[in-house]
Design a protein with these regions (language model features):
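An anion-binding loop in the catalytic cleft
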Residues: 1-72
Length: 72
């Protein structure tokens, strides 16, 4: 949707994925591929909004596995 999102809390996850592509979404957060592996986004802050759990952001903004961040 053309809005920026800041990743406020994240942690590395085992595995590999395509950089910038959501690998999975679950109750704990959103797993995204990077050039060096996977990251679990735990807390994010959408542009102009308060910080929120990444899982809530995914539900509210239609982020699903296969979504390419930067094209949401």
């Amino acid at each position: 949707r053309g809005q920026r999102v800041k990743a406020l809390r994240l942690r590395p996850e085992p595995g590999e994925g395509e950089p910038g592509v959501v690998a999975r979404v679950g109750p704990e957060g959103v797993v995204v591929g990077t050039a060096s592996g996977l990251l679990l986004l735990l807390e994010v802050q959408p542009e102009g909004r308060r910080a929120m759990p990444a899982a809530d952001w995914a539900r509210g903004y239609g982020v699903a596995p296969g979504t390419r961040l930067g094209q949401v």
